[in-house]
From Swiss-Prot:
Residues 839-849 have a biased composition (Basic residues). Residues 818-827, 1172-1181, 1334-1344, 1480-1496 have a biased composition (Polar residues). Residues 1-41, 126-147, 156-174, 205-249, 475-531, 599-612, 764-785, 877-906, 917-947, 962-979, 1002-1057, 1102-1161, 1182-1203, 1253-1280, 1497-1531, 1715-1735 have a biased composition (Low complexity). Pfam families: AFF4_CHD. This is AF4/FMR2 family member lilli. It comes from Drosophila virilis (Fruit fly). Residues 426-438, 1555-1565 have a biased composition (Pro residues). Keywords: Developmental protein, DNA-binding, Nucleus, Pair-rule protein, Phosphoprotein, Transcription, Transcription regulation. The keyword Secreted does not apply.
Amino acid sequence: MAQQQQQQHQQQQHHQQQQQQLQQQQQLLQYNNNSYNLNYNMEDPERRKRREREKYERQQGIQSDDRETSLFGEPRRLNPNEGDPEITAALGDFVDARDYMNASTVGIYRQAPGASNARLQALPKGFGSATTSFSSSSSASASSSASVPGQLPTSQQQQQQQQQQQQQHYQQQQRAPTYLKQADNKPPYNGRGGYPGQPMKNDIPSSSGMAPPRGPPRSSSSSSSSNNNSSSVSNNATAAPTSASTSSPLGPPMSTQMPNGREKSFLGPPAPALPNGGRFVPPSASGKRPSSTAGLQPPPPENHINKIITEMTNNYRVTPLTSIAATPHAPMRENYNLNGPNKFKYAFDAVDPIGPLNSPPAAGASSLMTPLLAPIAPITSPIAPLLTTPPQASQLPLPLPPMAGATTVPPSMAMGAVAPMQQLTPTPPKASPTPPVIKPLKTEKNHSLEKQDSCLENDLELSESDDERKKDSRSAGNSSNSSESDSSESGSEASSKGDPQQQQQQQQQHLLHQQQQHQQQQLLLQQQQQQRLAATANGSKKKYSQTIIASGANTISGLLTSSGLGGTGAGPGGAVNSTGSAAGGVGSGSGSTGGGSSSSGMGTMSSSNSSNKTPSPTDSNRWHLSRFFPKPANQTAAESVSPGVANAMGNVSMKVPGILPGGAQIIPESIDVTTAIVKNEKLHDDSRHMDDDEDEQADQQHQQQQQRYGVGLSVTVKKEQLEQQQQQQQQQQLLLQQQQLTAEQLALAGALPKNQIKRESRLSDSGSGSSGSGSSSSDSAGGSSEVLPMPGPGETLQIPGVPAAITTVMRVPPATQHKAQPNSVTLTPIGPLPASPKPRQKKPRKKKMSAATAPPLDSSDEDEPANSNKKHALELAATAAAAAANAAAASVMPVAAAAAAAAAPAIKKGRGRPRKQAQQQQQQLQLQQQQQQSGNLSSASASSSQAKGPTLTAAKKPLAKGTASSSSSSGTAATVAAGSRKREHSSNSSSNGNTPTKKPNAAMAAAAAAAAAAAAAAIAVRAASSSDEDSSSSSCSSTKSSNSNSSSSGSDTDIPTAAPAVTTAAAVAAAAAQNPAKKRIVKINKVGVASSKAKRRFSLGNSSNSSSSETEEQQQQFLQQQQQQQQQKQQLQQQQQQQPQQQQLQQHHQLQQQQQQQLLQGHFAPELPLQTLKQSAQQRLSSSDCSSSASSDSSSNSSASSSSDEDDAHRSGKRKSDKKKICTLTRIFNPKEGGAKKQGQVVIIDQSEEQLQQQQQQQQQQQQQQQQQQQQQQQQQQQQAKELKPRATPTQLLGATLASPARTTTPHLTSLMCKIDLSKLARQHHHQPERLKTQQNGHLSSRSAEGARTPKELQQIYAPNGYVGGALGGAAGAAAGNKLLGGVKHEHGVKPEPELDAGYEAKYKPNSVKQEFMLKQELPARRRKRSSSSSSSPYKEKKRKKEKAEQLSKELLPVPVLLPANNHERLSRDKLELLLQQQENSANASPNKLQQQNARQLPLSQSQLQHQHQHQHQLQQQQSQSTATGHAIASTTSATVATASTQLPTTCSEAVQTTPPPAAPPPAPRLIYRSHFDNEEEHASDDHRKNDLLLQEAIRRKRAADSERDSFNQMTLYLEAIVYFLLTADAMERCNMEATWTMYKDTLSLIKYISSKNRPYQQLTNGKHESHNIVAILSLRCQSLISLKLYKLRRANCRATIASCSEFFRSGRGDILNGNTPSSISPSNSVGSQGSGSNTPPGKIVPQDIHNQLCKQNEYLTYVNSAHELWDQADRLVRTGNHIDFIRKLDHENGPLTLHSTMHEVFRYVQAGLKTLRDAVSYPQSQ
């Protein structure tokens, strides 16, 4: 029956695919909306879910019992009715997955696995397809998971029974009854927590099968990851199979340890007690459905399943069964598990099931994909992986990724991906007959959504995560809700928090079950750490989602796929959720935290899904990676063999040997890291993995994926980062103990709080947690073995709580790390996207970070987006650099691997990065992580967001400075890096923490976090030194290979320097060994190379951007959180170590700073202010990581400056697209996306007292330094003046002029990206001259009306890529002329001023001025965003502006002294003051508005601006000679003027809220007001032929519009015809007034008619019709002007009429009607008089001529009234439609349209507006 119904349903679907898709999408939307509303507040999604679960328990306790009975009793789910095809499909999938999981893994039914295994295995193929489709419809899959138990009709019940029998031995491993909650008459959550003895109440008919999963099963339905964490449901029986497959021991401990007894009770007893076995109720987790269904009807469903899968992929692509299993699972766990441990459950189950799931893993919703691969492996090795991928949408990047991505993506995306799924699906179904079952399950799934009230509620809980994920993914800015991350992540958090011991047990059991090796155990420990991080990820949930959202739809899909969002929260669908939960939960079976990747990879991944960690999605993505798909299919047996190992290596088909034999160090670690994989990173990385990983790099890629994902995810959450640091410290401690910790490591992993793991799962989303967990896991796999050899630092890093897995990795890489330090990319610390809650991804990663990076960052994330993207980009660059370095030195490979682990997210981000390099870097990162608790953060570029980035940056700067100094400082940096990375990676998260500024912060942060670094001081010094440089350079961007082979392109250049770097690395290693706690060895290879110096300068600028992007508050929070987490994680020892280390580091940095200042004063006077800044940062060190980075920055000022200069050259050579820059800047400052979001990357910390003191000190120092700098700058300017003409290339400019000024400026930026503190204002005041030049001019040029383009004047001077010639001069602080020409350098100049532009520019430091130039065009909106986003809150922004105004007022006083008081400078000062006042007045007032106003006023004629620019440039040169400040201000002023009419020198400073210094300098362009008489239009020619041509053109366009069918095109053609008619009428005006009148009047009638057709679109507020609104605005303007013109044409007549009428009324003539009048004039009077006439009212008789005149007067005056009324309507529409920016830009480019505008001006204005609209419609992305 079930098969027949399935066949019927398949036919129906074939006939009704579109309808079903629409219905399913609608249902999913509704379901998602409901779940989204339920989980709308992501602040306490777990609380809400817990309350809901408790509510379900109370309300449906009996119902759950009924449900169990009905689930098993009713086969109707399997046999879907026409009414419930979708529900049946969902349930069918769930049944298949459940049966399969029960049979292959520890079956819910405890039946001999043989009976159902074949079916389940067969099912996985079909089921995988179905799962993929379910992935697309997460809500549907969630309901299917809920309804699966109901669907377990006779056949399913039989399957379940068989599976129970088959899986009894598996369950014996899991011992579900042991974990099952004893029947205490306490109702389970709608049967989700159904107990074996309890009958399930089937209050929801469609979810009769789903009812049991309602509590935890929802999460279980969300994915097999739910299986672990919940799926706290009987699903643990189902999930237990998954977990059993991952690690049989883990499965039972999961259920037992589930914080919510329900899930455990569901897992254990249900299978033995009922046909459902109560377990079956848990199987309700969709993850199990496929196995149950598969077991039921393997062969017949096969064909049906193929069809069903295709249909389901089309219909449910967003929410495949896997998604349902995973997504409901994660939310269920969160809801069901009131405690954080639920996430751990996810991770645990994922780990345990992975091994057994091999082929069965498909049973798990998220692992459905895996089973598909396993069963399909022979037949559908290509297709199977693809099919496998879709269920885990998170793995979009893989070949299947499109499908998976579609699955992850919202319904529209799901529809897109479904088609490939369908194609792929049919093939896998052929491989396995069982797949057809999936189809009915899917059908049932939709039904469950529609029909099952209780089940729907459960599903809503499950689908809440899915829906919220979808919504979050849909709304890039809504990531904070991130229901996906919330549902799966919070679920994983609950599991990780509540079930730390369970996770430990599960992991221990999993390790025991696998008995693979240390590596697997280490992986588990790492996963646990990741789970801890996942717990830390509680805060990162929002950030995680935001990262994904910020990344964008593409990145969202990719990120979802990459971060295992498929299960967790790829908002798009249940598939994503299932993948996220399953993949995230398992994290690669080896690590509960990293489990997510396993679920996405394969059945093994489904096990990881059981782990149900939010980061597990990253793992699942990793598993879904192409290498995972083919290999898991091939490795079905291997995966089933060891769930954890299968996770680590099951998808590890490529890494099976490496993981299994090597202790799963390669794959399991990567999988673990994958658990923390950032959603955004996943998109980019998956494709990359598809390319590189399938072959050699499977193991490394697993590590890389885990690390990358972990990095990306960990970046998002600061707490996670702190926790990761602590976990890393524990891991480092374990490194010493790892050999002894084989059993202990499992215990340690279990001991790690699941909360931490949960946070890590979020971190995996955000990148920081996952990088922390991933780095730890990768460390255990890749470098723990070598780390042990490492001296004290590695040992110090060994934290008792850290998983032993790190030991394995650490052991191998230590020597390699030392070697790799110079060569290997120090990427690990860099990539700190998570610094601000992403984005996000979001916001995209810095565009400058790397070209390759930026594109992957497109979306997201990730998100994450922008920040996550930037971070990923940096990571990619670092990965490429690390790969190059690794290639150069094989011995360095381990260190490079650790760096790669950190850079892995970057590599994943950048599709161009080869995976091998990424893998090597990941290994290096792992080693570094093992060495340093901060190593985790540093190891993951994304993890740099963990505020660990500072170490990398700190290390990088010392390296840049010199080999000796870098080695000495790098030693300190290495230890400091551990602590500072955590802080700074969070700060660097947006800017990738690669920037030198970050590095100094890293040094200081390392001093603060030295405890972690102390343990791994030696190792950290070795691994971190190279990785620091690499990461910092990678953060700079792929182009910046200077500091290390951080970027692929940069790596090429750096490879030459890599050889010397290796030698220097040896010296650095020695230095590190000497003082590991004090220094981190930064890439020394660049020290001796001049070009490397330039690169260092560039990297410095980049790091400063990232550093400034991170706020001191964030850093402080990270430090505090890190310390707290360390205490919580029993890392007090390391904390103690860190504290002394921090103190030592601080002292050391201070000494270094002093020395460096002396050196800089001797060598580079301009750097002195930076040093002072660094000192001030050191003072702040306790308060923020920025201080540490600042101190380290001082040590590496000169080298970093030079490197940044060189990088600037590369950057200018490799110009990033202005659009990318703008996107990066916007995302960074977009509060929703990452940059300054929430805490705000550029948070102005009101450390007024400290800042005032620092400012005073800095001002004094800066004054001295400025004098020196001014002298140097004058000299340089003279040199540059010579070079001004040749300075065509930014590289040349950088090399020649950037030396000292760039360094000086760069150190500021490097010192504090986030520090927009008031102290910055004082600092900037001293440094303002240089900063103003670079920042204001650069910003102005970037923000000029041209936008990305450099102002025309600047272009004439030649400013490459929007480098303003004059403006850039200030940035370098050198000759204004030279720097003006060398825009790139001045960008560096801007970068060096993290405190000035910390909010705006520091974040975009990699993009630097280029981005700002780009911003100039998009100036209005982006500036606003940046200014507002730069400040964490409006209040802060207000406060900041007020302080800025005060400081500016103070600074302005000295500035006049410095500057010759010329009118222009006075005007600019006045303008700055005025702007500051305006900013103060409006807390949220964006500097954009002020700048725009300035731009409007500025647009004197370009000639005037040019003249002023030249004059100012001369003044600047003179002033620079006389005084640096004067020069800086003059250059800024000239740069502003040069920037073009829209020159807004203060724009950047204002928009970035660049503390008063940028605004304070007179560079602020003086307001230039446009005169109404300036552009008096010449009269049109009287040539009749020309007029005829105009008329013909108008008629031609009107006729074209008449035949146009597209509403927008029609409106634009009509409007063009109108303006041509207006030109014709204007030309006729001189010939025939009457004809002109007629023409205008007819034109007005025509335009009114056209406007009436456009009104319906105008009323629509959605973005689709935004263009229609703008057309309406232009139309209203034309109507107004035409009406006014008609009045003007009749003005004389109107005057005569008014005079005549006035005379009539004044004279009073006119007969008065009296009652005796025989007849009244009006018929009404006659009627009223009724023949007498006596009742007619009195009145005047108006003569006919007067009446006619009154009518004419009314007509004329109506024109006047209409003119003003229509104009006001247009203005209102501009404001209500949020089109101010568009109109403002149009006004700037074409002059404002006023009531005085001539028809020719109207013509130009409207034509320009329509052209811009068409471009926007044709190329929406470009807009």
